[in-house]
Amino acid sequence: VVSTSLLVSVDRMGDVAEDKSSFYSNAEDYWREVPPTVDGMLGGYGSISSIDISGSKAFLRKFLGDGEGKTGKGRALDCGAGIGRISKRLLLPLFRTVDLVDVTQEFLDKARTFLGDDAKRVGNYYCCGLQEFIPEPDRYDIIWIQWVIGHLTDDHLVAFLRRCQKALRPAGLIVIKDNVSYEGVVPDDVDSSVCRDLDIVRRLVGRAGLRVVHEEQQLNFPKEIYQVHTLALR
């Protein structure tokens, strides 16, 4: 989730691509051991949750409402949802229905109670890695992808974004919010992920046939973690 790796930046995606199965299985093993709590979802940085949600809400509200190019408020998809922290505080207050997808069944089981009364507005809980997940076409107004793209290889990220584009309703929006490295690709062997720089993320977005329509840096996060940027894609 929140990458605190301070390793020297190197381009390692080539190595990862050669051993996809262990890249994914090691990540699944890591998350299986993480407690199903907000602090667990945020790598021990539970204290930043409110700042994160406030920033995301301000970002998202620029696109919601009536009028040309505005996004509907029908259904959202929370990718890498964990226990539903983002669904509970960001998506369910703004959308009628939310679907959750995560690779760890224990987190999705916890989400059913963590979401409280709002759980009745959850459409589906999908237990699946994003590299294999196929969202239903023409279903979502917002697809929210936060702190999870580092768990996908370049090719799988591009393919997933293409599937997400097909899953959008008219005027729908894909949002990526994630850590970005200062240069290149930085591997994190602890949770079996990578952190890419912004230029690489933008290039992969372009390969998926999408364009960045708005971009912001999340402010007021601890200085020791990588910068976090939010990108709206169409």
Regions from the PLM with identified roles:
Residues 2-4:
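Extreme N-terminal basic, low-complexity initiation segments
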Residues 6-136, 152-163, 172-234:
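Class I (Rossmann-like) S-adenosyl-L-methionine-dependent methyltransferase catalytic domain
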Residues 144:
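A conserved beta-strand element that flanks and buttresses the S-adenosyl-L-methionine
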Residues 148:
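Hydrophobic adenine-recognition pocket in adenosine-nucleotide-binding enzymes
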Residues 169:
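Short, conserved loop/helix-junction motifs that constitute active-site signature segments
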